[in-house]
Structure formats: structure tokens, C-alpha cells
Regions:
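Absolute protein N-terminus
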Residues: 1-2, 102
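Short amphipathic
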Residues: 3-10
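Rieske [2Fe-2S] iron-sulfur-binding domain
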Residues: 12-102
Length: 102
């Protein structure tokens, strides 16, 4: 099992915000949904848009390129739940957001 890796300080991600980070060399999007942190692949399955640059509305992120939307808590596409982006385990320790990749 892989280790949890520091992604950023919890204070850098305000509620309702999403951000792009690199974790263990992989592009990851982090989301603060009402104080809970979620992590997904940063790549939209439609055309590869950067989800961390999208708009977060509750638990749903809207891809900035073509408006595909994803539930960040499950990775499911809101129009077709059979389509899923990878999600990653997250924990917050000592004010740091840690993500487990692969």
C-alpha cells in the first residue's frame, strides 16, 4: 500500500475552492466541500480539461473546458454515473492535506 503524501497546507484551500497540485508526480485536483477535503484526478475524461481549474458547487466540479460535471466525493459523472474519474484517499494531519496515490 502506498503512503500518504503531503499535497498542501489545509489553510491554502478554503471552503468552496478547488486547486491543482502534483502528488507523487501525478496531477491531482483537491476540493474543499464545506470543510471536507476530496481528491480526484485533475484530468476530465471528456477532453482532458484541468478539473482543479473548474468551478465547485457543493460536491460537484464543473470542468472549465466543456462543462462536464463530476461528483468529487465519488468520481462519478453527474450525467452518466458509469463514467468515473479516479478518486484518492485524503486525510488532514497537523494542518497538512495528505493524499494517497495508487
Amino acid at each position: 500500500m502506498s503512503e500518504f503524501v503531503r499535497a498542501l497546507a489545509f489553510s491554502e484551500l478554503s471552503p468552496g475552492q478547488c486547486v491543482e497540485v502534483s502528488v507523487a508526480g501525478k496531477p491531482v485536483a483537491l476540493y474543499n466541500v464545506a470543510g471536507a477535503i476530496y481528491a480526484t484526478s485533475n484530468t476530465c475524461l471528456h477532453r482532458g480539461g484541468p478539473l482543479g481549474q473548474g468551478a465547485l458547487d457543493g460536491p460537484v466540479v464543473l470542468c472549465p473546458w466543456h462543462a462536464w460535471s463530476w461528483d468529487v466525493t465519488t468520481g462519478e459523472n453527474t450525467a452518466n454515473p458509469e463514467l468515473k474519474i479516479p478518486t484518492y484517499p485524503v486525510k488532514v494531519e497537523d494542518g497538512q492535506v495528505l493524499v494517497q496515490i495508487g
